[in-house]
Amino acid sequence: MAEVSSAKVLAGTTATLLVQADTDGCRVLVHKDQQHSIYLGGADVTTTNGFLFDHDGTVDISLPANAKLYAVSVSGTEPCYILKIGNA
């Protein structure tokens, strides 16, 4: 049975942890609806090496076991809405 959790995380101009996968991995939905872009990646994510997640939308990511997903904002803080679906 899958465990489901949700959170609102404010991504800042330095790498901000959005979610950490469980020991057997998880599926993560990240929704963003504000004006500035963010970049997704590992702990070393920046606006030059991250995966661009533009203004409006939702991205669906499968995280491997114990992986961590970070985000960094182009400007200020950007709210990111997280839905984590993991295995029990």
PLM feature spans:
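Short intrinsically disordered terminal tails
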Residues: 1, 87-88
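Surface-exposed ligand/attachment interfaces on beta-rich extracellular proteins
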Residues: 1-24
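Intrinsic-disorder/low-complexity, polar/charged segments enriched in Ser/Thr/Lys/Arg/Asp/Glu/Gln
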Residues: 14, 25-27, 56-58
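Forkhead-associated
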Residues: 22-33
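Noncatalytic modules at the cell exterior or secretory-pathway interfaces
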Residues: 26-28, 63-77
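Short, surface-exposed beta-strand/strand-loop-strand elements in extracellular ectodomains
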Residues: 31-49
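Edge beta-strands of jelly-roll/beta-sandwich modules across compartments, strongly enriched
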Residues: 38-40, 76-85
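Beta-sandwich interaction modules
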Residues: 54-66
